[in-house]
């Protein structure tokens, strides 16, 4: 709808003189608003000045100016004369966003009533909520949250800026960087803001805070973010970690705080190859050096030489007890690799004289080759005195760039290969990552004890749980692997499962198809692992989804694969949900879930019209189940004894309903260990195994019926950070 022209006389076009008057009145209106002269504003509006006039440079309208000045009276006056509350400045800011900057709740309320969108943003992605957080306006923040503001919205900026990895910050990041403690606590405690959200550079609120030297209250803010679970190994500009940033700040308290966190990577290197300890020595920070040494920081750099170069005798004296030989490299005999498979070759490489490529010693020879790749190969290497696998790419290789970008952005994670550094030399890129012992394909071929114990395949569950966790981590950082296969899943010397080979990975911006590819590959990997690699993965890739589902050995595996093949709309969070799938439950947990549901009062008293029994009822069009006539499948002596309890009390015996079956399982669990039930226990054996084998589709049936209801409270909940259970096999699988 066009804005009416209040300055055009009836009956024809305006004269040149009247046009000059209009322009002058428009300019005067803006100046009157800026001065807060409400009388003059009213006079000009009544005279016909344009309420939507804007100055040429930045596009400020009278309404923008009135909101900035906090003049409710002038705002109302302008709105009554046709001022457009949706008009944007040249940077896309609306009057509503300006009100967020000012933290004026009254003006926010007025503009919302005029149709403003609570989540509208300018060209840099700033919303009123983000502006309130950035400026510490707690009252405005609470008001906007109550009106539906998106707490975790990321700044959506222009395509050109996204290419430069700009934008993507959240309100929490702004509040943390600016040192607004009250707003930070409100966002985390009351509004449940995502503490580890990442911007387009992969930075979270913690690293943005530590790298901003102007941030106030930095120690308290860091403590709050860490307590709420912020990733302490995240990387920021130039590959800096929070620990490195704290050392560069020369802030001993921050260093102590970070070193106290479990999982801190004390030896992480920035893009220049510097560790926190090296920086502390170079900056002559004796107290921080002491802290890092006591925490076991790696002493592989020329630390004593650096201290001597700086003529810091006290620091030299501090370092000497921690450095085995400050003047020479350790002899080959004193260097022992962790790898058993590659140990002999690594010792040979360590002892030979080779020209160093930066911090890397490598010999491009078949004796030290791990595997071939599409562009080159993977070789053994020693990087900074650490055994590594080195992927060799052509210089400026798109695949190599993808590999480095993904590894850096995703940071350290126990289910991804660790990234130690890169070197460039003579047209080649050398990417150094953690060295592993086997591919998944090789590992499944190793001789081991029978992995399936009493029908429960803990071995497969352990491996797949690690793989799922690694892929989930990848997706949370905005990457899709695109090449999940047994050759790209590795097992290290500690039997930990690690995802590798990210040279085909894609940075996705919400395109679900990228993630669907990973989920489909995961579905095939589930079947591959469960079947112990008996069917080659390439063969599984040629089979359609329906054929693969029919190959599943049990209902839990079948449903898990189906969920991966058909994730629905919630593609991004699919793996988060599936980590709680019955496939990953132990048999004891499955049995406990059935007992707990059976312990619901509606089931115990057979309340036929209850919501729970209605949910559990078998629908007419559903396929037949193993438990449809369940009373006939229970051992007759056990069934008779359990029914006898009700017959004595002249109550109905157990019926062929799901509710009664759950009630039966509950009662068995409550009484089977009683002395008088010894005979029953001898017949049933382990109840968890008995019911799983007798009714193999019962657990998945209950799960699918109740997973979207309040009764999911009976399901075992995965811990915040899933750890992989001990597996049978050569040494077990670790997380």
From Swiss-Prot:
Residues 1-21, 714-735 are annotated as: Disordered. Its main location: cytoplasm. Manganese or magnesium. Required for optimal RNA cleavage rates. Residues 26-51 are annotated as: Binding to TMEV Leader protein. One of its GO terms (cellular component) is mitochondrion. The keyword Repeat applies. SUPFAM superfamilies: Ankyrin repeat, Protein kinase-like (PK-like). It holds the Pfam family Ank_4. Residues 229-242 are annotated as: 2-5A binding (P-loop) 1. GO terms for molecular function: ATP binding; endonuclease activity; protein kinase activity; ribonucleoprotein complex binding; RNA binding; RNA nuclease activity; zinc ion binding. Expressed in spleen, thymus, lung, testis, kidney, liver and heart. Its cofactor is Mn(2+); Mg(2+). Keywords: ANK repeat, Antiviral defense, ATP-binding, Cytoplasm, Endonuclease, Hydrolase, Metal-binding, Mitochondrion, Nuclease, Nucleotide-binding, Repeat, RNA-binding, Zinc, Zinc-finger. One of its GO terms (biological process) is positive regulation of transcription by RNA polymerase II. After binding to 2-5A (5'-phosphorylated 2',5'-linked oligoadenylates) the homodimerization and subsequent activation occurs. Inhibited by RNASEL inhibitor ABCE1/RLI, a cytoplasmic member of the ATP-binding cassette (ABC) transporter family. Induction: By interferons. Virus replication in higher vertebrates is restrained by IFNs that cause cells to transcribe genes encoding antiviral proteins, such as 2'-5' oligoadenylate synthetases (OASs). oligoadenylate synthetase is stimulated by dsRNA to produce 5'-phosphorylated, 2'-5'-linked oligoadenylates (2-5A), whose function is to activate RNASEL. Belongs to the protein kinase superfamily. Endoribonuclease that functions in the interferon (IFN) antiviral response. In INF treated and virus infected cells, RNASEL probably mediates its antiviral effects through a combination of direct cleavage of single-stranded viral RNAs, inhibition of protein synthesis through the degradation of rRNA, induction of apoptosis, and induction of other antiviral genes. RNASEL mediated apoptosis is the result of a JNK-dependent stress-response pathway leading to cytochrome c release from mitochondria and caspase-dependent apoptosis. The nine ankyrin repeats also called 2-5A sensor constitute the N-terminus 2-5A binding domain. (Microbial infection) Interacts (via N-terminus) with TMEV leader protein; this interaction prevents RNASEL activation by its substrate 2'-5' oligoadenylates. PANTHER family: 2-5A-DEPENDENT RIBONUCLEASE. This is 2-5A-dependent ribonuclease.
């Amino acid at each position: 709808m066009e804005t009416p022209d209040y300055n055009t006389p009836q009956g024809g076009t305006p004269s040149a003189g009247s046009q000059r008057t209009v322009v002058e009145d428009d300019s005067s209106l803006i100046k009157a608003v800026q001065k807060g002269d409400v009388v003059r504003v009213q006079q000009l509006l009544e005279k016909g000045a344009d309420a939507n006039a804007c100055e040429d440079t930045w596009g400020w309208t009278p309404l923008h100016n009135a909101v900035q000045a906090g003049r409710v009276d002038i705002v109302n006056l302008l709105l009554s004369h046709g001022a457009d509350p949706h008009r944007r400045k040249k940077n896309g800011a609306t009057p509503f966003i300006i009100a967020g900057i000012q933290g004026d709740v009254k003006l926010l309320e007025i503009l919302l009533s005029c149709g403003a969108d609570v989540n509208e943003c300018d060209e840099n992605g700033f919303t009123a909520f983000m502006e309130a957080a950035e400026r510490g306006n707690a009252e405005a923040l609470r008001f906007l949250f109550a009106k539906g503001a998106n707490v975790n919205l990321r700044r959506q900026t222009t395509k050109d800026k996204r290419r430069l990895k700009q934008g993507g910050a959240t309100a929490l990041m702004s509040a943390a960087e600016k040192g607004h403690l009250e707003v930070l606590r409100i966002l985390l405690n009351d509004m449940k803001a995502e503490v580890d959200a990442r911007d387009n550079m992969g930075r979270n609120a913690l690293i943005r805070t530590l790298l901003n030297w102007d941030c106030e209250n930095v120690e308290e803010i860091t403590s709050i973010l860490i307590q709420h679970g912020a990733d302490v190994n995240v990387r920021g500009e130039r590959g800096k970690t929070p620990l490195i940033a704290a050392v560069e700040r020369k802030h001993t308290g921050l260093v102590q705080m970070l070193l106290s966190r479990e999982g801190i990577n004390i030896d992480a290197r920035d893009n220049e190859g510097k560790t926190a300890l090296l920086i502390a020595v170079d900056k002559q920070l004796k107290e921080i050096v002491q802290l890092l040494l006591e925490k076991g920081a790696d002493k592989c750099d020329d630390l004593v030489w650096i201290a001597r170069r700086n003529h810091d005798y006290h620091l030299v004296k501090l370092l000497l007890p921690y450095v085995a030989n400050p003047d020479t490299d350790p002899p080959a005999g004193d260097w022992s690799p962790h790898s058993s498979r590659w140990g002999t070759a690594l010792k040979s490489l360590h002892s030979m004289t080779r020209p160093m490529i930066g911090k890397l010693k490598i010999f491009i020879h078949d004796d030290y080759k791990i595997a071939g790749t599409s562009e080159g190969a993977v070789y053994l290497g020693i990087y900074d005195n650490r055994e590594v696998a080195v992927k060799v790419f052509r210089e400026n290789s798109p695949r190599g760039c993808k590999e480095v970008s993904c590894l850096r952005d995703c940071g350290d994670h126990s289910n991804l290969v660790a990234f130690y550094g890169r070197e460039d030399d003579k047209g080649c890129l050398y990417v150094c990552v953690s060295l592993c012992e086997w591919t998944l394909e090789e590992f499944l071929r190793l001789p081991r004890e029978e992995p399936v114990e009493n029908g429960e395949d803990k071995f497969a569950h352990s491996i797949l749980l690690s793989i799922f966790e690694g892929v989930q981590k990848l997706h949370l950082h905005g990457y899709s692997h695109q090449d999940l296969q047994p050759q790209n899943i590795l097992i290290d010397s500690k039997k930990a499962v690690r995802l590798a080979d990210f040279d085909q990975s894609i940075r996705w911006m919400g395109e679900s198809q990228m993630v669907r590819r990973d989920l489909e590959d995961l579905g095939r990997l589930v079947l591959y692992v469960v079947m112990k690699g008996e069917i080659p993965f390439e063969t599984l890739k040629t089979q359609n989804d329906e054929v693969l589902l029919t190959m599943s050995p049990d209902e839990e595996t079948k449903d898990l694969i189906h969920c991966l093949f058909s994730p629905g709309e919630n593609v991004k969070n699919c793996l988060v949900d599936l980590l709680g799938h019955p496939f990953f439950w132990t048999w004891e947990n499955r049995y406990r879930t059935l007992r707990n549901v059976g312990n619901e009062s509606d089931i115990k008293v057979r309340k036929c019209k209850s919501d729970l029994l209605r949910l559990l009822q078998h629908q007419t069009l559903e396929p037949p189940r193993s438990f449809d006539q369940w009373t006939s499948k229970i051992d007759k002596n056990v069934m008779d004894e359990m029914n006898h309890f009700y017959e004595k009390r002249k109550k109905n015996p157990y019926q062929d309903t799901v509710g009664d079956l759950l009630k039966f399982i509950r009662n068995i669990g409550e009484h089977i260990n009683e002395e008088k039930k010894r005979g029953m226990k001898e017949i049933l054996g382990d109840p968890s195994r008995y019911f799983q084998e007798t009714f193999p589709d019962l657990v998945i049936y209950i799960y699918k019926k109740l997973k979207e209801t309040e009764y999911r409270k009976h399901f075992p909940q995965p811990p915040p950070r899933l750890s992989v259970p001990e597996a049978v096999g050569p040494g077990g699988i670790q997380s």
